[in-house]
From Swiss-Prot:
The protein, known as: Non-structural glycoprotein 4
Topology of the protein relative to the lipid bilayer: Single-pass type III membrane protein
The keyword Zinc belongs to this UniProt entry's keyword annotation: no
GO MF annotation, one: metal ion binding
Record note on domains: Binds 1 calcium ion per tetramer.
Amino acid sequence: MEKLTVLNYTLNVITLMNSTLHTILEDPGMAYFPYIASVLTVLFTLHRASIPTMKIALKTSKCSYKVVKYCIVTIFNTLLKLADYKEQITTKDEIEKQMDRVAKEMRRQLEMIDKLTTREIEQVKLLKRIYDKLMVRATDGIDMTKEINQKNVKTLEEWKSGKNPYEPKEVTAAM
């Protein structure tokens, strides 16, 4: 009985695979199958050929790792552009450069915020001092002599010459 279930399961899997292959081959999208197969063949060949080439390049040159890495990234970015992808592969060096640029910009903005905050604090202190000077202070008794300008009023007898110096005089002009 067990052998029959295993045989039945195997036949079901074969039938499923056959029906799947028939639906794939009947699909009009399969017109692109030769192109897809050729691209996959080229990629596989590049993969198989690049590993020994990289090993030789790493052994013969001291700085070849960066060169090979740059070449591989360039090749993959070119393939992605050919496939109309907007994304690109970046190396760690490029990511570090971008992170440094972002960190530098953040530092610059923090310094600007610090300067602006310092200026605002100084302005608030200045406004407080101006407010304190303009603040009306209550007094017990108000001296009105300052208001009506009578504090330094002198009488005619108190003037040195006996005349009021602010009195108008007669002036004659030559013609």
